[in-house]
UniProtKB/Swiss-Prot annotation:
Could be part of a binding-protein-dependent transport system for phosphate; probably responsible for the translocation of the substrate across the membrane. This is Phosphate transport system permease protein PstA homolog. Residues 70-285, 413-623 form the ABC transmembrane type-1 domain. Disulfide bonds: none annotated. InterPro entries: MetI-like, MetI-like_sf, Phosphate_PstA, Phosphate_Transport_Permease. Belongs to the binding-protein-dependent transport system permease family. CysTW subfamily. The chain crosses the membrane at residues 22-42, 64-84, 113-133, 143-163, 266-286, 303-323, 368-388, 417-437, 453-473, 486-506, 535-555, 613-633. It is found in: Cell membrane.
Length: 654
């Protein structure tokens, strides 16, 4: 008996110690992440270091002024945020308050598809379709900052819609009922009460969306080509220019022919600056999300209000215009004894005022419809663009979808599948064990908050920063490439994307474990069941659905990534297949055609885009419909299916 108890305790301690060790090794990994970035940044050289805070940018002349690239990044991101917030919030109001739950669920699936589309496909769409709109309809330069603002706005719209919709679902619906019972209509309740109620959350959503926009790299390179900042600004053609953002400067010069150690040091510093900016934005978002924090630190509330007022300046002023029209049109404000003769004018103007108010509410609903049409119309447009043109490209004689040579879409698909398989094999067990320790064993709120902050902050980092880490550590230090320190390899790409996916999987596994009712654990402990047995026999089986969905979403994330693979795995595949040799993925194959001189480069982009989008839609279908449907089948139904299957086998034998 004592031996059994000792064995049981040994197993219990083994899981706890092992998962805790992994969790703290995870922290060490990300400390080394920052150390390696800083180490590479110190190689900048004195000439470049002196020029960092100047206005001149010309890496060939050792001028690396950061202000103009940073200014372009900020202006483009703010422009995209203004458009995305206006369309996204109104679309969310339409989905939550105008649509039935079944319709909302189906429309939300379309938004999930938009959020899963790789950024390089957005870039391809902007360079091929949006450019025509700007050139032929607006009579503006086709490839410009205005094009990028439009593209980025639709890239961050899914973030705004999904987060705002989730926020609205938690708002008490009694607020609307109370306002309606006082004589106001539903639209008035939404915009006067609900919108104010979610104002702090909206600020957090806008901050996260801005961080996503400012960190975009690969899609921007499809449109922006110039680094002549001083010349463009002196000629007063900023918005119609094709000046590069800070992130796209990194991806442009990281493998340039004239690149040396000092230029790479400059690019690492640019990456660290983006890292700091995004970290501060995420820190503000996480910190200000807590109402108690806003009460304790009033300056946070002022910053939050400032962000809200800047982004909503135009919509709020349009609404204020209608309020002014409805309030100032009445010359007779109130009927009294001394103006009884003016009662007919009073009622006439009052009626006109009511008409203006109704028109205002009608316009709000109309705006919701237009915004919803724009959001879902863009999804339809990009899907039609990919499916129609991709199908034509696949049916051409030059299609390489079913070829597995070095420069083929089939080989890129195989490389992507290999990367997915190895990455998931590495990261999923590690992420699950770390999530188990954080959720089931750790009792310290401070430790849990530190881990959650690190995970949330690093999860939203620009993926090109991870690419720089992979370049400096896996290729330059460990030399995990057949070409040595200056080469690229599939294994370097796999390990780099594993770092990215590990963060995502830890968080999603944590959420899946949290969704399991704590009453089940308490009941099991009351029966004398050990914590290890509770985890493996109760918690994990109950969280299985969430864990499978997390796994599928992580595969989706791997397929959609470009920057980490572009820097570590290369833009082309080797003639031989080996993990130590270069290998392009589906997304890097699309991006690599930007630098190709082949006449069929666009066709290659289109056929690869079609393969990627079909793959992603299947994954989203599995995670949103198939997996939940399978788990809705109760045990009895599974037994019925099993008995029918056995009867069929018996019948087949006879």
């Amino acid at each position: 008996m004592q031996k059994k108890i000792k064995k049981r305790l040994k197993k219990e301690n083994l899981l706890r110690i092992f998962s805790k060790t992994l969790a703290f090794l995870f922290l060490v990994l990300f400390i080394s992440f920052f150390v390696f970035l800083l180490t590479e940044a110190t190689k900048i050289g004195p000439d470049f270091a002196k020029s960092l805070f100047n206005l001149e940018f010309n890496l060939g002349n050792k001028q690396a002024g950061i202000w103009f690239p940073l200014l372009v990044s900020f202006i483009v991101s703010i422009g995209a945020l203004i458009i995305a917030s206006y369309i996204g919030v109104r679309t969310s109001f339409f989905l939550v308050y105008r649509c039935k739950p079944k319709i909302r669920k189906k429309l939300s699936l379309i938004i999930d598809i938009l959020s899963g589309i790789p950024s390089v496909i957005f870039g391809l769409f902007a360079s091929q379709i949006l450019s025509i709109f700007f050139r032929d309809i607006l009579k503006l330069p086709p490839l410009s900052l205005l094009n990028v603002i439009a593209m980025l706005s639709f890239m961050i719209i899914p973030i705004v819609i999904s987060l705002t919709t989730n926020t609205l679902t938690y708002v008490n619906n009694d607020l609307i009922s109370v306002v309606v019972s006082l004589g106001e209509n539903k639209t008035s309740a939404i915009y006067k009460i609900i919108k104010k109620e979610i104002k702090p959350q909206l600020t957090v959503i806008l901050t996260l969306a801005f961080a996503r926009a400012i960190s975009e790299t690969m899609a921007v390179n499809f449109v922006l080509q110039s680094v002549n900042y001083q010349e463009v600004i002196n000629n007063n053609r900023f918005f119609t220019s094709d000046l590069k953002t800070l992130g796209s400067v990194i991806s442009t010069f990281i493998f340039s022919e004239n690149g040396d150690e000092q230029i790479n040091g400059v690019l690492y510093i640019f990456g660290i600056i983006i890292l700091i900016l995004v970290s501060l934005l995420n820190f503000f978002a996480i910190w200000s999300a807590n109402p108690k924090t806003l009460e304790r630190y009033p300056f946070l509330k002022k910053i939050s209000n400032f962000i809200y007022q800047v982004v909503w300046f135009i919509p709020n002023n349009i609404s204020a215009l209608f309020v002014d029209l409805t309030s100032t049109r009445q010359s007779v404000k109130k009927i009294k004894v001394n103006n009884i003769n003016e009662r007919s004018l009073f009622f006439k103007e009052r009626l006109q005022s009511v008409v203006w108010i109704k028109l205002n509410y009608f316009l709000k609903i109309f705006q919701e419809l237009i915004c919803t049409f724009l959001a879902f119309g863009f999804v339809l447009a990009i899907l039609l663009f990919v499916f129609i043109n991709g199908s034509v490209a696949i049916n051409n004689n030059g299609s390489t979808v079913f070829s597995f040579e070095a420069d083929s879409t089939g080989r890129a698909l195989v490389n992507t599948l290999v990367i997915i398989l190895i990455t998931i094999t590495i990261t999923f067990p590690l992420a699950l064990l770390i999530a188990i320790w954080l959720n089931e064993y750790n009792n310290s709120k401070v430790v849990k908050n530190v881990f959650n902050f690190v995970i949330d902050s690093l999860s939203s980092m620009p993926s090109i920063i991870y690419g720089l880490f992979g370049l400096s550590f896996f290729l330059r230090v460990l030399q995990l490439s057949a070409g040595g320190a200056n080469g690229t390899s599939l294994i370097a790409g796999i390990l780099t994307i594993s770092v990215v996916i590990l963060l995502f999987l830890i968080r999603t596994c944590q959420q899946a474990l949290n969704n399991v009712s704590w009453d089940l654990r308490i009941s099991a402990f009351a029966l004398g069941i050990s914590k290890r047995e509770v985890i493996f026999k109760i918690v994990l089986p109950s969280a299985l659905k969430g864990l499978i969905v997390a796994l599928i979403l992580s595969i989706n994330r791997i397929i959609a990534e470009t920057a980490p693979f572009f820097i570590t795995s290369g833009l082309s595949s080797s003639n031989l297949f080996h993990l130590s040799l270069p290998g392009q993925t589906l997304t890097t194959r699309i991006y690599g055609q930007l630098f190709s001189i082949n006449s069929n480069a666009i066709s290659v982009m289109l056929e690869t885009s079609l393969v990627s989008v079909v793959f992603l839609i299947l994954l989203i279908f599995f995670s949103s419909y198939l997996i939940p449907s399978l788990f809705l089948l109760n045990k009895q139904k599974w037994l019925v299916i099993k008995s029918k299957f056995q009867s069929f086998k018996l019948w087949k034998r006879t």
